[in-house]
């Protein structure tokens, strides 16, 4: 197994000697057959080896200085034996295999995913991977879930289109979300750094096979549909229910097997990976919440209260797409709409919040365009996300028109637009619900409004486009309940569980 070599890696974390006995006790409980329905496996690092352990077997592996992996021990079945990227691709295939058992699941790039996580000094002692079926609504989860490196939860859509992109349609290939930043930089023609990379810590690769170097866009406009199941999105495009995203696919390429998110496959860790090209274990935004051993404090980054300041936890020296653009064109203008990972951007929604100058926020979503009132009335999250996304479109349209809130702006060389509705709807209703489909239609309409504004500005033909999600979304099984924390507490194991997956022993 190999992995793309990464930038300079931190010392990282592995189980300390004083916690070995506690780790063994925790593993004995987590891998017991009674928890097998809700626990796929546990990932850890000890004795300078990475390990994946399940109830029926384990594998240990090491990484060399070139980023290559070697398996050094296997007992029973290797839980990470299937790292294919094409499994359950296509909506019909996914629906025919809902809630796959771990022995039937795939875990793309699993060795690299495990290693990058434990490259962080803030990594947990044990990372528990939920089963695909596990429904943990009793612990704050949802019908639709993500976080695992199981393929449906890890698989996000990726569309690259417009000027400078080959017209290939849907291709039977996979990418990684960390490929996004270097690909956008290459598409724009950003000058690489002396080491040949586009950002300081680059774990991804520029997807040059789908780019047309004979053409160079003047602008890249990127959209993120948070938490979108790629099979659902591509199917709706094919059936004419998402015509604007379908238009982008017709103008370029969609990765039919998706773009794999980084472990943990959660929001802010992967927003940051997309924009910086680095894995969470390298850029520092390790999860939506984690424990900082150095301060003895919990860190929460993915909340309304902490979004504006979440990038304070970035590893020093991390760069973004915005930085790559400015290094090549110092006078270029870039904009980040509704995106917490806004480092290097000239315009940022969350910079308004940091300055106490909050943009206009509608009181409610009723009567707003591209809003399905059937769901905004009964669903608080659908309502809130519709308001947030409408506010984002208002900012994007103002920037493209040249003026927002009476301030003039040039056309951005790079414009990033984050939409939240799909995540809210696919969590609440599940990815295969009518609520989920409505969220895709609403978000597609908002993309259409931005495309229309670009046409009115006269720059459409000079634009390239990228559309991704930060992770996938998998429907859990409401009958598959359970809580490993109860079992750990009953056995007297002293462990702090952050984000319901990261176990810190003795904390």
Per-segment meaning from a language model:
Residues 1, 37-46, 50-53, 124-129, ...:
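Metal-dependent active-site segment of extracytoplasmic phospho-/sulfohydrolases and closely related
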Residues 1-9, 208-212, 230-324, 340-348:
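Active-site nucleophile/metal-coordination loop of metallo-enzymes that catalyze phosphate/sulfate
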Residues 127, 159-160, 220-224, 247, ...:
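Structural recognition of the beta-strand scaffold that forms the well-ordered cores
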Residues 11-25, 167-182, 194-201, 263, ...:
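A short beta-strand-to-alpha-helix junction
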């Amino acid at each position: 197994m190999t992995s793309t070599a990464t930038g300079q890696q931190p010392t990282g974390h592995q189980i300390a000697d004083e916690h070995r006995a506690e780790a063994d006790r925790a593993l004995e409980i987590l891998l017991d057959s009674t928890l097998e329905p809700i626990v796929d496996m546990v990932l850890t690092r000890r004795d300078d080896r990475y390990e994946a352990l399940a109830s029926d077997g384990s594998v240990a592996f090491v990484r060399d200085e070139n980023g290559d992996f070697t398996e050094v021990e296997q007992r029973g079945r290797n839980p990470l034996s299937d790292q294919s990227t094409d499994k359950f691709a296509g909506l019909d295939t996914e629906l025919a295999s809902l809630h796959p058992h771990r022995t039937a699941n795939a875990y793309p790039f699993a060795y690299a995913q495990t290693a990058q996580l434990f490259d962080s000094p803030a990594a947990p002692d044990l990372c528990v991977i939920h089963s695909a079926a596990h429904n943990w609504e009793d612990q704050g989860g949802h019908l639709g879930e993500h976080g695992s490196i199981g393929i449906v939860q890890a698989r996000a859509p990726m569309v690259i289109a417009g000027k400078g992109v080959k017209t290939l349609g849907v291709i039977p290939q996979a990418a990684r979300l960390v490929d996004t930043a270097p690909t956008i930089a290459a598409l724009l023609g950003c000058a690489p750094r002396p080491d040949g990379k586009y950002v300081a810590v680059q774990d991804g690769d520029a997807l040059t096979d789908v780019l047309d170097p004979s053409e160079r866009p003047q602008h890249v406009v990127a959209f993120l549909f948070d938490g979108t199941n790629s099979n659902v999105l591509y199917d709706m495009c094919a059936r004419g229910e998402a015509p604007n995203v379908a238009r982008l696919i017709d103008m370029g390429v969609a990765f039919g097997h998706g773009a794999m998110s980084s472990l943990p496959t959660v929001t802010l860790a992967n927003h940051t990976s997309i924009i910086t090209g680095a894995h969470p274990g390298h850029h520092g935004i390790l999860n939506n919440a984690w424990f900082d051993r150095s301060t003895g404090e919990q860190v929460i980054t993915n909340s309304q209260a902490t979004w504006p300041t979440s990038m304070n936890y970035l590893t020093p020296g991390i760069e973004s797409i915005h930085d790559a653009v400015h290094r090549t064109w110092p006078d270029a203008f870039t904009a980040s709409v509704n995106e917490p990972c806004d480092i290097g951007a000239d315009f940022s929604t969350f910079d308004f919040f940091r300055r106490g100058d909050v943009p206009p926020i509608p009181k409610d979503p009723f009567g707003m365009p591209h809003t399905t009132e059937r769901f905004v009335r009964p669903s608080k999250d659908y309502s809130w996300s519709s308001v947030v996304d409408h506010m984002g479109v208002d900012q994007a349209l103002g920037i493209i028109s040249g003026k927002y809130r009476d301030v003039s702006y040039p056309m951005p060389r790079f414009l990033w637009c984050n939409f939240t509705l799909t995540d809210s709807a696919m969590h609440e209703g599940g990815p295969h619900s009518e609520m989920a489909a409505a969220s895709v239609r609403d978000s597609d309409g908002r993309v259409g409004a931005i495309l229309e504004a670009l046409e009115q500005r006269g720059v459409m033909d000079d634009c390239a486009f990228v559309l991704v999600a930060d992770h996938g979304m998998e429907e859990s099984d409401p009958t598959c309940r359970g809580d490993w924390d109860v079992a750990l507490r009953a056995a007297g194991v002293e462990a702090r569980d952050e984000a319901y997956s990261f176990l810190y022993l003795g904390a």
